[in-house]
Amino acid sequence: MALVNRNKKKKESTVHFSKEDQRKILCADSPFVVKEAYSSIRTNLLFSQKGEDCPIFVVTSPTANNGKSINSVNMAISFAQMGKKTLLIDGDMRNPTLHRLFSIPVKNGLSEILAGLTDSITVSKTDVENLSILTAGKIPPNPSELLSNERTDKLLSFVKQHYDCVFIDTPPVNLVTDPTAFATKSTGYI
């Protein structure tokens, strides 16, 4: 496997959220209480990481539209702001959102890697220092099967060598089995 970094042009705005969601994204202008809430979550996650060099946190929710993707982004930003080299993976290959939120192409995303269509792991750097994104890639017909194959283990082992922390945004756990594929591969679920 090879890691390919795709840099954003500085003239582009990285994040293209709806106005409502923009107010929810962690930034310098966020209210103190919001910053403090994510700092508290970050501290709790750091204490729960079992001494791992690169913890992997899987973010899910019981049902759709509970804000898990916004929380995934904010937790990843919180770790990146602390100086941790952070990778945010869009593990929702059924309804991917991170490529739209960050306006990045889906080439060589998670689905292509797990299907064996590429050996290149193409991550996109963001305007947030220390934060990179691996998109879900093109929507496959069989996400659960892809996540259950040995390439998932190889991918996670590979990214653990290059990052300090990994967050995986997954689909709702009560709707599909995809999030459970990470049970033995992750530090924990959020």
What do the PLM-derived regions correspond to, one by one?
Residues 1-190:
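P-loop NTP-binding module
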